């Protein structure tokens, strides 16, 4: 892990990590993570920042039209689907959670468009709670190294929880 940490320090921070460190805002972490799915990091940064200039809270985002959100987040991958998802999440946060992003996996998974990776990222980067964000890289690399033998990212998360010391849970995704 020491070698990985040393090498990763030479690279720019992933945008979602950067936004979490700069803002400590679980809502911005959640929205940036949704934008990051199937999108290059530079595009995630560009589109997130453009969107947050227009609207940085659930109330502000919910007040925007879907087309306005689409325009702000283009060229993020699947921008039309993401625009609807972001608007619906914002409305649900206002209606059911008093505009506060939930701090549990179970509650986060109730949002359409939020999977385990996104939920874990919100917990780890938005709330500094323990969690393991497993994307395709973490799944593929840990299996290739022979650290685990799993068939899906969900299985990988469970297996890593059993063998990885908790001090590495939050950082494993950034390291790989």
Task: Pin down the residues of each PLM region.
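Catalytic cores of DNA base-excision repair glycosylases
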Residues: 1-176
């Amino acid at each position: 892990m020491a070698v990985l940490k040393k090498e990763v320090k030479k690279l720019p921070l992933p945008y979602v990590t950067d936004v979490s460190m700069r803002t400590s805002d679980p809502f911005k972490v959640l929205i940036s993570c949704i934008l990051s799915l199937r999108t290059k990091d530079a595009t995630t940064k560009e589109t997130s920042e453009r969107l947050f200039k227009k609207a940085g809270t659930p109330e502000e985002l919910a007040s925007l039209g879907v087309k306005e959100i689409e325009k702000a987040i283009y060229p993020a991958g699947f921008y039309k689907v993401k625009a609807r998802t972001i608007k619906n999440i914002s409305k649900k946060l206002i209606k059911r959670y008093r505009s506060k992003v939930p701090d549990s996996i179970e509650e986060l998974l109730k949002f359409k468009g939020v999977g385990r990776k996104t939920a874990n990222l919100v917990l780890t980067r938005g709330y500094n709670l323990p969690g393991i964000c497993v994307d395709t890289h973490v799944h593929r690399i840990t299996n290739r190294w022979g650290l685990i033998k799993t068939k899906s990212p969900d299985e990988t998360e469970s297996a890593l929880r059993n063998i990885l010391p908790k001090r590495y849970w939050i950082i494993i995704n950034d390291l790989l």
